[in-house]
Design a protein with these regions (language model features):
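Signature of uroporphyrinogen-III synthase
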Residues: 1-183
Length: 183
């Protein structure tokens, strides 16, 4: 993304409009050595690795950005394309009937349902919109519905490029101007 903006003579200024915190919910059961662990976002991966020993799992991630959020040297058994609509169908072919632990946020869309035979979801963390000091900008790139809410709460009014249809829907719902949608 940065290369695209640089090529057009534009600058990117980043500011996350969400806060992630542990939910304090216990693990619903006892993970077995070599169970799969699916990490669905960079924030989830970083938080999970800070609180748990990830070496006991075979790790699957939503995409490359999530994999990169884990500590250096963490073995990743499978990395998805980053497209939530496809990832769980693809992952189901890899894990078969193995247990897959899914630490998820309070606002998850539960896209694994209907794909994974032995999904072990648990509400591991909360995502909350937060107010930030926005830099001067012409367009906002918003990566999630929660980020859209945080952007608006921060006084954002610029046209928005939303990552994914769910985010685009939230952008329209809260009255921001949708300039486009990226996959």
């Amino acid at each position: 993304l940065r290369k695209l903006f640089d090529a057009r003579g534009s600058a990117i200024h980043g500011a996350s409009c969400v806060h992630v915190r542990h939910s304090d919910n216990p693990t619903p059961g006892e993970p077995m050595t070599n169970d799969w662990l699916f990490l669905g976002s960079p924030q989830c991966a970083a938080l999970f690795a800070s609180l748990h020993d990830v070496s006991r799992y075979r790790i699957a991630t939503m995409g490359a950005g999530t994999s990169q959020s884990l500590p250096s040297g963490t073995p990743i058994a499978w990395t998805g394309s980053g497209n939530p609509e496809r990832v769980f169908g693809e992952l189901s072919q890899v894990v078969g009937d193995s247990a897959v632990w899914i630490p998820h946020a309070n606002r998850t869309m539960r896209r694994w349902e209907g794909h994974l035979l032995h999904a072990k979801p648990w509400h591991f963390y909360n995502v909350e919109a937060k107010v930030v000091q926005l830099p001067s900008h012409d367009v906002a790139l918003v990566s999630s519905p929660s980020n859209a809410e945080g952007y608006k709460a921060s006084g954002g009014t610029a046209p928005v490029v939303a990552i994914g249809e769910t985010t685009a829907k939230k952008v329209r719902e809260i009255g921001l101007t949708l300039a486009g949608t990226a996959a």
